[in-house]
Structures are given as C-alpha cells and as structure tokens.
Design a protein with these regions (language model features):
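Short, small-residue-biased leader/transition segments that mark boundaries at the very start
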Residues: 1-6
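Helix-loop-helix hairpin linking two adjacent transmembrane segments in secondary transporters
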Residues: 23-66
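A membrane-interface helix-boundary motif in multi-pass transporters
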Residues: 42-55, 245-270
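Multi-pass alpha-helical transporter architecture, strongest
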Residues: 61-67, 265-294
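Juxtamembrane intracellular "pre-TM" segments in multi-pass secondary transporters
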Residues: 69-105, 128, 294
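Short amphipathic helix-loop junctions that connect adjacent transmembrane helices
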Residues: 119-136
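Helix-to-loop junctions at the C-terminal end of transmembrane segments
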Residues: 150-164
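C-terminal transmembrane helical hairpin of 12-TM major facilitator-type secondary transporters
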Residues: 165-208
Length: 294
C-alpha cells in the first residue's frame, strides 16, 4: 500500500491509471512466479523457500530505503494523529469526502464478489463439468496470465479512450456478465469466454483506485490506501464462508434445487450493487459541487 501511495504521488492525471495498472500487473506476476519458485526451491528443503523469500525481502528493503526517493514532500506532510492511526479512525475521517465514502462501499461489494473465484472455482468446475485438477490449474493460470496482459496493456489504452469513469462502468458490466454466465451456462466451452469477460472486467478496480486517489490530497494518500487495505482484508473473511456455504447447500441433498452456480449468481448481484453505488457516488458529488457553486 505504500507502493500504491507513492505511485499516485509521482503520477499525473494522464498516467495515474496506467501506473496503477502496472502495479496490479506486478502483483499478479508475483502470484504466478512466486509459487513456481517456491515449488522448485522446496525440493532443496522445506525451509529453503522461506530463506530465499527473506533474502528477497531484505533486498527490497535496501532498495526502498537507500535508492527509492521520498515521494511526499516535507511541506505536504501532516502531524501524526493517533485517533486516525487505525482503520476505523481513517474511515471516519474519509467520510468528509463525499465521493470517497460511496466508492469505498462499492469496492467492498465487488471485492466480495471477486473472492468467489478463489473460493469455489475449483469446486464448481469439478462438480458441474467434471474437470480434472490439471484443467482447473490451467484455467487459473489462464486467469493470471491474461490479467497481467489486461493490466499492462489494455488499461492504459482504455483509460485514454474512455476515461476512468466510463472504463470503470465497462469493467463492472463485463464482470457482472461473466459471473452471470458462470452461474447459468450449461456448456463448459462457454466458461472460457466468460472468463475473458471476468478478467477484462478487472479494469474497474484500477479505474476506481485512480478516481479515489485523484480525489484525495497528497498528504492523505497513505491513509486512504491503508484503510482500503484493511477493508479488503475484511472481505476475505466474509466472502469464503458466504460462497462455500451457498455452494455446499445448493449441491447437497438438503436442497430441492440443484444449482452449483449460486455463488456466481451472488457475485453477479454484488457486482451490480457495486455499479449502482459507483454511479450514485458521482451523482452525490455533482450535487455537492452544484450547491457550492450556488
């Protein structure tokens, strides 16, 4: 999150969204390469991957401390406030920004929806389409690789052509459609076009991040990213029980309706709610601007 904050401070309005996309792509690449390296090093002992991870973290610390320039100028820094040095204090303070408050809520709903993939994708494809574990693994690799391409290449193109707001709306619609197809498709070949819609729909997250960052003062970027990090962590506690329990119920004998796609229907509805909140946030912001102008 300090990385995201620094990225915003060194970005301009023209390249902010592109830079957020690069950071997201970097995280995605790490999630692909990391397990490969860890699995390879594990052959030399169970402690080896952790030792190498510690060395890489130390190298990263040295680079950040000695070579990465401070992005927040001294005259823009504010005094430390213990009341705001926690997620709830930060969120309370962020409420004074009308655009931010509703966007944060929008991000919570879509984050819960996104966790449906990691929670039940393997269970769903094996249950409904009898996929092998290898095919599940290939599909997850497909998601990871294509996500990197989208964040590295497509985000910057769409940001220039559509702008952040329209790009976010497009992302919400594509993701919602992808989830809906997962839920109801009777054909497994349709899963891959649906995956494509879901992955490209990830552009909404990058666009919303850029919008929120551009609406905040420089000396409060770190607080915004920290609060968002805490809330996104909270969604990882909510989503897995919600998605797995609904899947278990509607694929079990106790349910009169057999519907393994129920988690993705829930995800589609949550994404629709996120889209509505996103659009509502701009209406609120526009009304506030008009009232101030009067």
């Amino acid at each position: 999150f300090p990385t995201r904050r620094s990225s915003d401070l060194i970005s301009t309005d023209d390249n902010r969204t592109k830079n957020f996309g690069l950071i997201n792509a970097g995280f995605g690449l790490g999630f692909i390469i990391g397990p490969i390296i860890g699995g390879t090093l594990g052959q030399f002992g169970t402690h080896t991957p952790f030792i190498v991870a510690a060395i890489l973290s130390f190298i990263n610390f040295i680079f950040g401390y000695y070579f990465f320039p401070e992005s927040l100028k001294a005259n823009n820094r504010r005094k430390f406030d213990r009341k705001r040095a926690n997620p709830f204090g930060s969120l309370k303070h962020l409420q004074k920004f009308p655009l931010i408050k509703t966007l944060v809520l929008s991000m919570i709903f879509v984050s819960i929806a996104n966790h449906s993939m990691e929670s039940v994708w393997a269970f769903f494809t094996i249950e409904k389409f009898k996929w092998s574990t290898s095919l599940v693994g290939y599909s997850l690799a497909f998601i990871g690789i294509l996500s990197i391409i989208v964040q590295l290449w497509l985000v910057s193109i769409l940001a220039k052509k559509l702008g952040d707001k329209r790009m976010a709306v497009l992302g919400f619609v594509l993701m919602m459609t992808g989830f809906f197809l997962f839920a109801f498709t009777p054909w497994q070949w349709l899963l891959f076009p649906a995956l494509l819609l879901f992955i490209v729909g990830g552009i909404q997250g990058t666009a919303v991040q850029s919008i929120m960052s551009s609406a905040m003062p420089d000396n409060e970027q770190g607080e915004l990213q920290g609060a968002l990090g805490s809330l996104m962590g909270l969604t990882t506690l909510i989503a897995p029980p919600l998605m797995t329990s609904s899947f278990s119920y509607f694929t079990g004998k106790q349910s009169e309706i057999y519907f393994p796609g129920i988690p993705f229907l829930i995800a589609s509805i949550l994404t629709l709610i996120s889209l509505i909140l996103f659009l509502k946030s701009f209406k609120k912001s526009n009304r506030l601007i008009k009232s101030v102008d009067k």
